[in-house]
From Swiss-Prot:
An annotated GO cellular component: extracellular region
Annotated localization: Secreted
Tissue: Expressed by the venom gland.
Protein name: Hypotensin-like peptide
Taxonomic lineage from the root: Eukaryota, Metazoa, Ecdysozoa, Arthropoda, Chelicerata
Region forming the signal peptide: 1-25
Keywords of this entry: Hypotensive agent, Secreted, Signal
């Protein structure tokens, strides 16, 4: 019985640690996004700024092995 209580207690502690680590990671990511948004673009051409914003809006590229093996004959 005591062993079961100890296991439950340790499990709860691990869960709390995991959730707090996730929250801290999300907070750091939010800060990074805010810092990127605060970039000063004065003196840069509008076309370059437009391309930067379009690139940042795209989802990250993923490697798809199915398309890699296809031949374009």
């Amino acid at each position: 019985m005591k062993m079961m209580i100890a296991i439950v207690f340790v499990s709860i502690l691990l869960l709390m640690f995991s959730l707090s680590s996730t929250a801290m990671g999300m907070e750091t990511e939010q800060q990074n996004m805010e810092e990127r948004a605060d970039v000063d673009f004065t003196g840069i051409a509008d076309s370059i700024i437009k391309k930067i914003k379009e690139t940042n809006a795209k989802p990250p590229a993923r490697f798809d092995p199915a398309t890699f093996g296809e031949n374009e004959d």
